[in-house]
Amino acid sequence: MQESTTRTFGLLQWGIVILTSITALIHFLLGLNTPLTTGWPFLLNAAGYITLLLLYALKVPVLHRYRNVVRWLLIAYAAVTVIAWWLMEGARTPLGYFDKMIEITLILLLWLDGQRA
């Protein structure tokens, strides 16, 4: 089913924007507060979230036909981030658990958004 180009940006989409922004900010701040040798993956993760969020949220006609692909890329990106965190040793902090809760909720909202598209 194709999405309408006049689709409204509702609460579900705003939830996706807010959760993606929060997790991007968390990763950005972790990257800044960590030595560069270990902080760069956090900075790259933040950049990836922001890039995918912009591709998802901006109403650019050329990108509109790829919105479903971007949604699935964002789901995969969040899932890989959760799995990478789970595989890392020593990353079990309250902030880490909070961020993973955000990312799992983000995956759910993106999936719901895809079902309603």
Question: Residue ranges of each PLM-predicted region?
Answer:
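Membrane-interface extramembranous regions
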Residues: M1-A117
